[in-house]
């Protein structure tokens, strides 16, 4: 990666897997209006506990959004990116998007601006996005063939009328490709989000990956469809299922070598706040935010200085660990699940983990492959058996769990299910621990390097 | 004639407000309301009523 690109992504948690250990994003829900209907979306229902794109608890005016951003910037030192990602479309509900960005940029000049869009109204705003220094854009592209698109989009609203069927999908496709090409021409980094819908577009996404790579997309994020009848989406009601973790991984693996894949996405809410994988949104609802907060950048500044100091150390340890695993040249692979709160370290207790990050150690080194969401085992100090059963199911296929602390009881239950767990490497760098573990597992530690 | 919004089904996304060519729609308190005096059903401006056409909820923006 060239240094100019690294500068653009090094503090954007979504565009860089490495950065997501350090930096946080926030979304403001200022753009509720949308110009297309997707079969996986329903804007009518909200639940605070639901982590689903498009879902929000409160819609904000640009002035309210500014208040919220300043309050979060004062309190969350990791904050680096402000995004507008629904519940509607940031380019369609353009006046509110623009007003929000202009206000925030004048108050907090160093915050990165980012939008997520379906692409239909994107081409008409690309120049203004560039002018406002919007550095990152995500376009949701689920198809490059309108016959596939027809199954995903019941209608679009374009040029003052509603289109349906193949006509709708064709217009959307053309606008998406045009918008992507325009962004690439202006040097704005693009991420493509695709929803993997089994039987509808799963294999077609291989073709999508090729098209977007050719048009300069920086990153491709293939996410599983979230579908539940209780959400009231069209797909939820028709019984269209989402893929399981192994199906998603299989598609990710087939896409290797195309446009670079994003594997650390958490499919967050359109009003999420904090590091990926955590959502502090409920701490910053309008009734918790001062009426006229004054921006104080001290915490963010201090945090950035700390990250700048420790980051090289982490990168060095990480590269060394990866090289060690690769050079051991072992055929077998190790699936490792890690409990972490960020900073690139194993620093979360097993019972408090809301997710596990999954790494694979193999002949090619150490690769981050995804994450598994779970209900935490500990509620108010003691473990719950039902939660543990859910965690064991979610950790299907994992060899070893690494965490900061774990009790004997859950450890034994995991062992019975064939999953080992250890807190031996608590607070170590993730990759360094996996490398040490790999050496022990396969007997390749320098003193006994015979394998 | 005019259109009206069935408030109980409306998601308050506001798309109708900015698509309306007659400025007939505004958020009043907790709901979007169409002013029947201003609503022209888009006659002479667009072929299709813009509010009903852009509304994401079926049967929510309907003839009064």
Curated annotation (Swiss-Prot), chain B:
Keywords: 4Fe-4S, Electron transport, Iron, Iron-sulfur, Metal-binding, Nitrogen fixation, Plasmid, Repeat, Transport. This is Ferredoxin-like protein in nif region. Its cofactor is [4Fe-4S] cluster. It holds the Pfam family Fer4_7. GO terms for molecular function: 4 iron, 4 sulfur cluster binding; metal ion binding. The keyword Transmembrane helix does not apply. Gene3D superfamilies: 3.30.70.20. Binds 2 [4Fe-4S] clusters. InterPro entries: 4Fe4S_Fe-S-bd, 4Fe4S_Fe_S_CS. [4Fe-4S] cluster 2 binds at residues 20, 39, 42, 51. Residues 2-30 form the 4Fe-4S ferredoxin-type domain. It comes from Sinorhizobium fredii (strain NBRC 101917 / NGR234). [4Fe-4S] cluster 1 binds at residues 10, 13, 16, 55. One of its GO terms (biological process) is nitrogen fixation. The keyword Cytoplasm does not apply.
């Amino acid at each position: 990666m060239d240094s100019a690109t690294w500068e653009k992504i090094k503090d954007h948690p979504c565009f860089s897997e490495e950065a997501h250990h350090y930096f946080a994003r926030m979304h403001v829900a200022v753009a509720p209006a949308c110009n297309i209907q997707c079969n996986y979306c329903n804007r009518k229902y909200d639940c605070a506990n639901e982590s689903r794109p498009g879902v929000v608890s409160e819609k904000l005016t640009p002035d309210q959004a500014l208040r919220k951003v300043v309050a979060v910037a004062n309190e969350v030192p990791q904050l680096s990116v402000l995004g507008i990602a629904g519940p509607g479309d940031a380019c369609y509900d353009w006046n509110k998007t623009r007003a929000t960005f202009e206000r925030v940029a004048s108050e907090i000049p160093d915050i990165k601006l980012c939008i997520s869009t379906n692409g239909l109204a994107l081409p008409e705003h690309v120049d203004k996005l560039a002018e406002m220094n919007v550095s990152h854009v995500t376009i949701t592209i689920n198809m490059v063939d309108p016959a596939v698109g027809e199954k995903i989009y019941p209608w679009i609203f374009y040029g003052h009328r509603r289109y349906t069927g193949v006509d709708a999908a064709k217009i959307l496709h053309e606008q998406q490709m045009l918008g992507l090409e325009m962004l690439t021409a202006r040097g704005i980094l693009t991420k493509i989000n695709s929803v993997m819908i089994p039987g509808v577009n799963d294999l077609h996404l291989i073709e999508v990956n090729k098209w977007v790579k050719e048009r300069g997309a920086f990153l491709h994020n293939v996410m599983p469809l979230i579908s539940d009848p209780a959400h009231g989406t069209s797909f939820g009601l028709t019984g269209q299922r989402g893929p399981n973790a192994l199906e998603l991984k299989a598609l990710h693996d087939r896409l290797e070598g195309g446009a670079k894949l994003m594997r650390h996405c958490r499919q967050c809410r359109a009003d999420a706040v904090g590091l990926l994988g955590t959502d502090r949104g409920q701490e910053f609802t309008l009734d918790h935010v001062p009426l006229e907060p004054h921006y104080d950048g001290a915490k963010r500044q201090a945090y950035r200085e700390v990250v700048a100091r420790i980051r090289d150390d982490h990168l060095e340890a990480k590269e060394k660990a990866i090289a060690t695993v690769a050079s051991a040249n072992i055929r077998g692979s190790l699936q490792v699940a890690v409990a972490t709160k960020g900073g690139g370290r194993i620093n979360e207790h097993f019972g408090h983990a809301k997710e596990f990050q999954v790494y694979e150690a193999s002949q090619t080194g150490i690769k981050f492959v995804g994450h598994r969401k779970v209900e935490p085992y500990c509620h108010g100090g003691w473990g719950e058996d039902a939660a543990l059963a859910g965690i064991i199911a979610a950790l299907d296929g994992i060899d070893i769990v690494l965490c900061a602390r774990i009790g004997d009881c859950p450890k034994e239950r995991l062992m019975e299910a064939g999953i080992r767990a250890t807190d031996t490497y608590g607070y170590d760098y993730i990759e360094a621990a996996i490398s040490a573990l790999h050496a022990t597992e396969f007997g390749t530690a320098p003193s006994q390097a015979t394998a | 004639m005019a259109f009206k919004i069935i408030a109980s089904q409306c998601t308050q996304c506001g798309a109708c407000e900015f698509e309306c060519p007659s400025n007939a729609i505004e958020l009043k308190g907790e709901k979007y309301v169409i002013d029947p005096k201003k609503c022209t059903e888009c006659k002479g401006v667009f072929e299709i009523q813009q509010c009903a056409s852009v509304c994401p909820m079926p049967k929510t923006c309907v003839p009064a």
